Amino acid sequence: MSDSSHNLLYNKFELPESVKMSPVEGAVGGIDKVARFVADPLEKGMGHTLGSALRRALLIGLEAPAIVSFSMTGVLHEYMAVEGIIEDVTNIVLNLKGSLLKKYPLQDCEGGRCSQKLRATISVDASDLAAAGGQKEVTLGDLLQEGTFEAVNPEHVIFTVTRPMQLEVMLRVAFGRGYSPSERIVLEERGMNEIVLDAAFSPVVLVNYFVEDTRVGQDTDFDRLVLQVETDGRVAPKEAVAFATQILSKHFSVFEKMDEKRIVFEEAISVEKENKDDILHKLVLGINEIELSVRSTNCLSNANIETIGELVIMPEPRLLQFRNFGKKSLCEIKNKLKEMKLELGMDLSQFGVGLDNVKEKMKWYAEKIRSSKNTKG
């Protein structure tokens, strides 16, 4: 880590106070499966930077369990039929691929990533068949007789039995990311008749994002990021975005360790932490009441900026657009405001002040303060 004396001071970045989450109208499954996230304001360009990174992390980075193999009484290979079962083994495999599992939070195998074998005994007798109209459906919920995993879709049909029988079924479940074809799945102690499946581990179905223009005060040169996330129910969209953010942070931390100069960001002053009356007394001061050079005072006067309130609400880029207003004047003004515990680009919305009404509001507050002093006198 570099010595703090070599730190670089950067202007503050506009950042959202929070990320807003909302349901997507008409989406199946509600907010537990589909949600929209809005983050604004962001500096220009950061919308696409964050949106693209989050999208990739959501699609390829999240882990979830999936069935990677199975075996069943009477099944020797994938290309066969089983007497008394409507579906052939190929269709049973397809149905197993549609199984959605999530793990109970407090149950874990050693190391957390090992595969686990789940065994179930399926017994179908004549009364079961009669009650089901001659065809007894065996669902994912029927196969999860051990309490390690929970089925998101327990009513999902795996196969259909047409005669009395007893079957032993073994499902092997593993954790992974993204999608893995069966050829890439390596199993320890694979059984002779154990059939390996392609596995869709990713719980994220779809991620879309777009970037809109938004404003801070009267400045419209900022981004609004809108991110829409759809999952299959194994994780909620809110969890998925939180996990993806942690994954990205983990990877960025590798580059942060480089022994280079550190950036210190100027932060916006929170008027909630300051006494509002004290701040108002500073805001209504005239520019000529603080010690600025003649050049800086004239620049502000030519820009029709008469009070500190009119000054601090201005974003720095806006000031630099004024005629004859250069870096030297900017530096002087920023230092003076820093002494007053103020800064450029302040959010004065708590006082009902914006760029469109700041001049009128400063006059109104100045009159209010004078009236208050006269009353006390």
Swiss-Prot record:
Gene3D superfamilies according to UniProt: 5' to 3' exonuclease, C-terminal subdomain, DNA-directed RNA polymerase, insert domain, RNA polymerase, RBP11-like subunit
Region (Alpha N-terminal domain (alpha-NTD)): 1-259
Molecular-function GO terms, alphabetical: DNA binding; DNA-directed RNA polymerase activity; protein dimerization activity
Enzyme Commission code(s) on record: 2.7.7.6
GO biological process: DNA-templated transcription
Cross-referenced InterPro entries: DNA-dir_RNA_pol_insert (IPR011262), DNA-dir_RNA_pol_RpoA/D/Rpb3 (IPR011263), DNA-dir_RpoA (IPR011773), RBP11-like (IPR036603), RNAP_asu_C (IPR011260), RNApol_insert_sf (IPR036643)
Annotated segments matching region Alpha C-terminal domain (alpha-CTD): 279-377
Subunit structure, interactors included: Homodimer. The RNAP catalytic core consists of 2 alpha, 1 beta, 1 beta' and 1 omega subunit. When a sigma factor is associated with the core the holoenzyme is formed, which can initiate transcription.
Protein name: DNA-directed RNA polymerase subunit alpha
Organism encoding this protein: Chlamydia trachomatis serovar L2 (strain ATCC VR-902B / DSM 19102 / 434/Bu)
